[in-house]
Amino acid sequence: MNRTDLNQGAGGIDNFVEAAKALRGEPHKGHKGLVFANAWVHQTVESMCIASMVDPKGDADIIKAQEKFKETLDDWIPKIIAAQEPDGYLQTAYTLSSRNRWPSKWNPDQRANHEGYTAGYFIESAINHYTMTDGQDKRLYDAAKKLADCWVANLGPGKKEWFDGHQEMEQALVRFGRFVNDMEGNGRGDSYVKLAKFLLDCRSNGSDYDQSHVPVQQQYEAVGHAVRATYNYSAMADVAADYQSAVLSLWDNIVNKKYYVTGGIGSGESAEGFGPNYSLRNGAYCESCSTCGLIFFQWKMNLAYHDAKYADLYEESMYNALLGATDLEGKTFYYTNPLQGGQRTAWHVCPCCVGNIPRTLLMVPTWTYVKDNGGIYVNMYIGSTINVEKVAGTDVQMVQKTEYPWNGKVAITVNPKASRRFAVYVRVPDRTTSELYTTTPKVSGLKSLSVNGKAETIKVDKGYVAITRDWKAGDKIEFEIPMVPQRIKADQNIEADRGLVALRYGPLIYNVERADQANITQAIGSDPLVAEWRGDLLGGVMTLKGKWADGSPLVAIPNYARNNRLGQVATATVAGDSTIDYSGGATTGTTGSGTAATPAPRRGRGGAGGGSVVWIRDQQ
């Protein structure tokens, strides 16, 4: 869904072309779009690079798309590099601005210009471009080092104290520093990691909106802008041990007081951010980018603590809050993801989610396996073939065959190049990590577990079963995760969900839609729910079937597939919790040049939205 066509025009790659002209002393146009618009281009480059590393397995559409990506990268990369200033600085809004307007870079009065936000996305795009080319094309990598060196030369102890209004540079610098060390050795990237910590430590005497209200070590409640917050917490979890007390408290506050059942965050009271504890309005916020940030945070926590509960949660967020952020054709997207109402749009005046959604989804292989403690952690169950390098001195191919999340049977073939002894840690899903929600019936553990047909003892530690043995090519792990329809009740402190129930099957949260039943504001009946596969519906989904209290049939579909059918216009409002609009500059389409076209109608309280809800009335 990454719109390379829309990044061609104003606010896109053209800004780099004009900045290069300015650096050459040629006549040029001014910067177009938001001051941080470079970020959309960098996100798009990163997404194209990751997508180009996917094995198409002969799929003609994927091959065609990858050819288009290569053509676009060949066009864009020289333009991006040409816009980099001689000292390594890169942000076209500054290069193209009057120095009377912005007399200095890294100005504390101009934190909203997002210098680190755009620079961080550039660095992350360079990492993936280097990886895509197997280090054969170092153009972006070298440019990213030049940029990072520029920041190190200007910011740091004894130089200048500063922090950005929108975090991203911090986690990018940590990632890049470690990547440079892996590629070049000798601690070449250490200065970048140190700068990341310095930028975090500079955050104080500011606003809770951008998490600078108190030093990061003293932050224990998630506040402010949800995307900025999760990027901040992700970097904290990754970079230093002395942040861990705060990080654990922040994680606990999010998951047990500010976490939607879909895995989304941010109820919107604080301008695209967190509200008070237990304030989880169903018509509100849940920005797609905040879900991306939460996934990054959960992943970093999983890396730090090797506890499966973090993977349980990023699986929830991935399947529900993020996967459903696009329509099934990948042509429209949600900037916000309210649990009732809302319609996707083709573009937005601030299209940060357009690049963030695909780059995060394309990182699924990263979320699936983690290598550490002399073994391999299996965190997600997805039919796939992935190579894990240097496990106990050998490379290991992991082949998963599964229809999860439609059923719970999983087979993993372990193919080390050479027979070696190591552990494979199998995640045992737990749907009860958040204290905000209780499920009926309770489901836990594994139904069975075997290696090469021989039953294994199921002993769970921190959410994993460790299977340690001398592995040889062809060894097969087989297990089954129990999958039954469940009803979910929310903590009574969540006023918006009192008297309501949600439905779940495995990791999937379900919606009821007017496309399947006319009245979705009535109470659900007490009859058992049944899972039924519908290959003819929404590209193939497992539906849940039951009865409403009046005996009429009830059909529920996975939340990710919501609002993909025509004719869903009227908002379904449950318990007086109405849809809240955050679309702002959302547009229903674009002009040929990629600029915004017809504005979508604003939807305030009680306005139009989709006939689809997560929470439905419980039978009293």
Each language-model region and where it sits:
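Aromatic (Trp/Tyr) and acidic
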Residues: 1-63, 67, 71, 101-134, ...
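Long, well-ordered core segments of solenoidal/helical folds
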Residues: 1-27, 72-89, 142-158, 194-212, ...
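C-terminal beta-rich recognition modules with glycine/proline-rich loops and embedded aromatic residues
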Residues: 4, 247, 312-320, 325-415, ...
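Substrate-binding cleft and catalytic face of glycoside hydrolase catalytic domains
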Residues: 83, 88-97, 129-130
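Asp-box/WD-like beta-propeller blade repeats and closely related beta-sheet repeat scaffolds
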Residues: 95-116, 123, 137-164
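A surface-exposed regulatory interaction patch that couples sensing to output
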Residues: 207-224
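Flexible glycine/proline-rich, aromatic-decorated loop/lid segments
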Residues: 259-276
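Extracellular Ig-like/FN3 beta-sandwich strand-entry sites
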Residues: 421, 474-476
